[in-house]
Structure formats: C-alpha cells, structure tokens
Amino acid sequence: MSFIVYPALDIRDGRVVRLRQGDYAQETSYGDDPLPRTQAFAAQGAQWMHLVDLDAARAGGYTLAPLLSSIRAQTTLQVQTGGGVRGRDDVARILDAGAGRVVVGSLAVRRPDEVVGWLEEFGAERITIALDARQDAQGQWQLPVHGWTENADVTLDDLARRYARAGMRHLLCTDIARDGMLAGPNISLYQHLSALLPGVAVQASGGIRDVADVAEARAAGCGGAILGKALLEQRMDLAEALAC
C-alpha cells in the first residue's frame, strides 16, 4: 500500500483557518487566498491535498466548488474534500466539480446503511469515510456526535469493520483530543486500526507536528497522513514529509 501525504487546508468564509479541537470559537486565520498555498503544495511535490469546507460542515451545502475547480485547473493536485455532505446528491456534485475523493463524516455515523451504498455506487476509491473518535475511561474508542456532546450507539471498531466488509478503501480517523493541538498523533490508535482493517488505507489525522511524526504514522501501518497546522505554521517542510 502506498503512503500518501495530504497537505490540508480548512476554509471558512474564504479564509484559510484552523480550529482548535473542532471549536468554531477557537479559530486561527492564516490568510485570505488559499489558491497560492495549493500551488505551493504542488510545487513541493504533493500529489494529493485535503480540503475542508468548514462553512458547509456547519450549515450544509458545499461551497468550495469554484476553488476546487481552480485547484484542478491550475495545479496537478488530486483533491480529497468534504464538508456538509448531507446526501447522495452532494457526493455526486462534489465529484462532478473535480474531487478525487469525497470525505463523508457525520453521515457515516448517523446513516451507515445509506453511506455503504455510496461505496458501491461511486466506487470505494472515490469515498473517504471520516470518523472522529475519543477514548473513554474504559479504553473503548467512541464516536461522539451532535457537536461531540454525546456518543453514538456504535463504537469506532464496530463501525469501521462494517465499512471494511462493505468494501471501504480509505478511512480518515481523527483523535479528537489531538486535533489542532500539535501534540503528536495517536500512534497506538493507528497501529490498532491498521491491524484491524487490512487492505484499508488509514489516514492519520490530528496532532502531527513534524516529519518524525509522519514517519511514525507510516511505520504504524497508515496509508496516509493529514498535515494541517504544522505546515501552516511552518514547523514542517512539506518536501521532507513527502520523502518519508
């Protein structure tokens, strides 16, 4: 399985931002024009990037189609993107706008029967299942829902296995406690998921600080790593990360 480094941009009101642990009230802005950043990603050798529509994630209705089209026209990047996917037609529209893969998050927890059907309809290579997880006091990985205020009635392991049986090829898993914290990725979580889900490219997301963390994620069996805040704050060289 190849290992893919995904430089990431989160977009809100047209700006490049980062949220601390997903909290819209804890936002840091990194400028108004995302396109030059994507061009820099490509110039440094990236083949893929990860693009998140934070406005749509909150209110629905994917808003980044014009940006996505510009990225595809002006760079060589393939784009994995999501935010605000509320149904099948949203997936189709985002793919039609030029996405290489569509990220399906909260709906993957709330309506798995429907999302399983999309793996077959659109192809498992075109869908990334994204699960935000938090470890409880008993060591079980739960899936918080409703703004991370309560847990779903299914665990991370059980839902991930269900999607794997249905043909899932790409799983993006974020340890909520590490998101935007630059505290290092939860390597034990990714070792566990990689062993649990043979043949699935598990993407490490949350807490990656430097090239050593990227190398550690790869060694843990991951198929990819999402690089967000560390790149924006120039704590990491993308070309070095791509060489891991």
Curated annotation (Swiss-Prot):
Belongs to the HisA/HisF family. Its EC number is 5.3.1.16. This is 1-(5-phosphoribosyl)-5-[(5-phosphoribosylamino)methylideneamino] imidazole-4-carboxamide isomerase. Keywords: Amino-acid biosynthesis, Cytoplasm, Histidine biosynthesis, Isomerase. GO terms for biological process: L-histidine biosynthetic process; L-tryptophan biosynthetic process. One of its GO terms (cellular component) is cytoplasm. One of its GO terms (molecular function) is 1-(5-phosphoribosyl)-5-[(5-phosphoribosylamino)methylideneamino]imidazole-4-carboxamide isomerase activity. InterPro entries: Aldolase_TIM, His_biosynth, HisA_bact_arch, Isoase_HisA-like, Isoase_HisA-like_bact, RibuloseP-bd_barrel. The active site is at residues 10, 132. It comes from the Bacteria. HAMAP family: HisA (MF_01014). The gene is hisA. It is an enzyme of class 5 (isomerase). It catalyses: 1-(5-phospho-beta-D-ribosyl)-5-[(5-phospho-beta-D-ribosylamino)methylideneamino]imidazole-4-carboxamide = 5-[(5-phospho-1-deoxy-D-ribulos-1-ylimino)methylamino]-1-(5-phospho-beta-D-ribosyl)imidazole-4-carboxamide. It comes from Stenotrophomonas maltophilia (strain R551-3). Gene3D superfamilies: Aldolase class I (3.20.20.70). Pathway: Amino-acid biosynthesis; L-histidine biosynthesis; L-histidine from 5-phospho-alpha-D-ribose 1-diphosphate: step 4/9. It is found in: Cytoplasm.
